[in-house]
Amino acid sequence: SVGFKAGVKEYKLTYYTPEYETKDTDILAAFRVTPQPGVPPEEAGAAVXAESSTGTWTTVWTDGLTSLDRYKGRCYHIEPVPGEADQYICYVAYPLDLFEEGSVTNMFTSIVGNVFGFKALRALRLEDLRIPPAYIKTFQGPPHGIQVERDKLNKYGRPLLGCTIKPKLGLSAKNYGRAVYECLRGGLDFTKDDENVNSQPFMRWRDRFLFCAEAIYKAQAETGEIKGHYLNATAGTWEEMIKRAVFARELGVPIVMHDYLTGGFTANTSLAHYCRDNGLLLHIHRAMHAVIDRQKNHGMHFRVLAKALRMSGGDHIHAGTVVGKLEGERDITLGFVDLLRDDFIEKDRSRGIYFTQDWVSLPGVIPVASGGIHVWHMPALTEIFGDDSVLQFGGGTLGHPWGNAPGAVANRVALEACVQARNEGRDLAAEGNAIIREASKWSLELAAACEVWKEIKFEFKAVDTLDPE
């Protein structure tokens, strides 16, 4: 008939297309959908596809001015979640033309910007995204990547060691710099600003940068190793953030830091471009991630945030510990650690990976294990994360009974012992405690650390677990 048919029609008539064959250029999404009672899964899945692409609640005559078939998102497959009543995984394909090139901001605004408040859904979670190579090639990605970082630091064949300076708020710049020096001098590769250290009344950013640079150069001169401190450039405006990064570059330090979720993807991508152009490494903290990713049935899984960060740009990102005080189940954590580091990752539902992901030539990101870890965890961390990682001990360095430098010595000795044992073919998982005990005979600092933390464990069940097979 001529003209258009006004009124409301079911989403599934247009947006549920089980016969659709996905294209190599489509962005694919896996959503965990919990429909409201009485809403069939096909309608719920189609609603997700519609509301995150071309749809609106009623038919509009301007639909006739474009080709919906070319631009609409399509829900092409739905499967029930085993062990959960009323939960479904809905797979949605989005045509590449819906997205601005090189903009994580636009990608998220489209895919998750509006649909999560949709009334027909009780809850909605984005579990995974497949980013096609055609879209990945529009991003610069990490400023440098894993291999370039190793070459800049001249450190190979072992994980890197870090430490967050505590107390995170309240120290003066000079005392802060002193703690940085002691940790680096003791044997750590990096120290770190906490995520909420920006430029507060008790310590303005410029003073901190100067004292930390002094600490770095002094520790480098005394140890003959390249050292770094993650200078947090996060600020209230984009211009101020870049100003801080420029000052860090002028001081000649190797690395700056950004809180990418609170700072925002637009600011983060700008900073990543600046860092590549000017030879700075970029450490990323994921402050605010648990607001988005912790609930199992609503929000966005961290593996999606991790993929987005690799596209936006960062050389390090915090990725849980598996063994410390912060959330992270082993298989799931290793799944997104591989997504950060490797060039090509096969679909593997047992690790929560819903799609095969090809990163083509985008550099990798080093995962950072941080939060409630100490020397007794070293064998497990070395085994789980391997060489391309940063192991970060805040309290596990600064809480040493003899002070900061001995705390750093203890961590470095423990790490070197674990790496040597692994290279000799010993089983770190089975012999970990024995390896640490042997090493502590040769290091009084390590022996003291072993004594303090011998019984500390953070044993709680993970909130976000895999579905039963």
Curated annotation (Swiss-Prot):
Q: Could you say which enzyme class this protein belongs to? A: lyase
One record GO biological process? photorespiration
**Entry keywords, A to Z:** Calvin cycle, Carbon dioxide fixation, Chloroplast, Lyase, Magnesium, Metal-binding, Methylation, Monooxygenase, Oxidoreductase, Photorespiration, Photosynthesis, Plastid
Annotated residues for binding of Mg(2+): K192, D194, E195
Q: Which Pfam families match?
A: RuBisCO_large, RuBisCO_large_N
Its annotated function is as follows: RuBisCO catalyzes two reactions: the carboxylation of D-ribulose 1,5-bisphosphate, the primary event in carbon dioxide fixation, as well as the oxidative fragmentation of the pentose substrate in the photorespiration process. Both reactions occur simultaneously and in competition at the same active site.
Question: What family name appears in the similarity comment?
Answer: Belongs to the RuBisCO large chain family. Type I subfamily.
Q: What NCBIfam families does the record tag this protein with? A: PRK04208.1
- The name this protein goes by in its record: Ribulose bisphosphate carboxylase large chain
